[in-house]
Amino acid sequence: MAVRPEAIAALPVDQVMGRDRACKEPLLLGEQLFWAEHRPDQGGRTTLMRQVAAGAAPQDLTPGRWSLRSRVHEFGGGLFCASSELAVFIEARSGIPHAVSFSPGAQPRPLISGPSDECGRYADGLIDTQRQRWLGVRETTSCDQLVALPLSGGEPQVLRQE
């Protein structure tokens, strides 16, 4: 059956080309709302946003060159987690967790030192505030692991391996 041209609805170019910003992975922590925001108008990067209270202006926690992305199992996984003092996100280029505090002007810092290809791929984290560590999934070339990383930075501690 042929489709008549007059039966095809006109779609806005931005919708067809995927140029609209998209929000994903909302997280509510007390009165604070966090989300990952995909920005096609900024080279396709995904940024971490925080709104401290209803009606307050949102804050970009990963401005400029920073972008969130996980490549665990090629499909990715959870991009970020947060506590009352900081957020941890998976940085797109390195694939490793980075922490950023909520202090004005704070810059993200890696939780692991060393080349990312030796560190594995990370995702699906949470912050253990009592022990001051990030817990998450690490995929290596040989297995999947549940690991802990000190929030101050350091080497991963393997908690479980499959």
Language-model features: locations:
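Conserved beta-propeller blade repeats
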Residues: 18-32, 67-87, 116-134
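A flexible loop/linker signature enriched in serine peptidases of the S9 family
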Residues: 37-47, 68-74, 89-98, 115-122, ...
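Multi-bladed beta-propeller domains
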Residues: 1-22, 52-75, 100-121, 149-162
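Hydrophobic alpha-helical membrane-insertion signals
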Residues: 10-53
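Beta-strand C-termini and the immediately following turn/loop, strongest in propeller blades
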Residues: 30, 35-41, 51-52, 81-94, ...
